[in-house]
């Protein structure tokens, strides 16, 4: 099954997708926030184009599992997404996905400008990979 991964941010949101078999994740695009309506129009356009079976969203938590302001912002984003799409939504705890993606890109020799263009997509890839590594019976969509 194909999934779409999201690394949500208040300025930039990274999007990644899996192959049709749901085995490998690939960076897809970065959506730059302008207005909420424009953001969701672009996101839903990608969803329509990719036709995933579900959407996987990274949920940033502190090391001890505590929630932060960005955690609440992600939860609000997920609530708005669920009002606009009937696809199942999965949350995956993520720590440092953007930081680690940035480090990987720096080590690969990308300039700051090049890293800025793709770091959120790479973070979305990491989120999808975390999801794909879960046993099938632990991939539980949000209810309600």
Curated annotation (Swiss-Prot):
Example of a GO biological process term: rRNA 5'-end processing
GO cellular component, one term: cytosol
E.C. number: 3.1.-.-
Pfam families: RuvX
Record's keyword annotation contains Hydrolase: yes
Entry annotated with the keyword Hydrolase: yes
Keywords: Cytoplasm, Hydrolase, Nuclease, Ribosome biogenesis
CDD domains, sorted: YqgF
Record localization: Cytoplasm
Main localization of the protein described in the UniProt heading: cytoplasm
MF (Gene Ontology): nuclease activity
Enzyme class, UniProt record, top EC level: hydrolase
Source species, domain of life: Bacteria
Entries under InterPro entries matching the protein: RNaseH-like_sf, YqgF, YqgF/RNaseH-like_dom, YqgF/RNaseH-like_dom_sf
Family membership: Belongs to the YqgF nuclease family.
Function: Could be a nuclease involved in processing of the 5'-end of pre-16S rRNA.
The protein's name: Putative pre-16S rRNA nuclease
Organism: Oleidesulfovibrio alaskensis (strain ATCC BAA-1058 / DSM 17464 / G20)
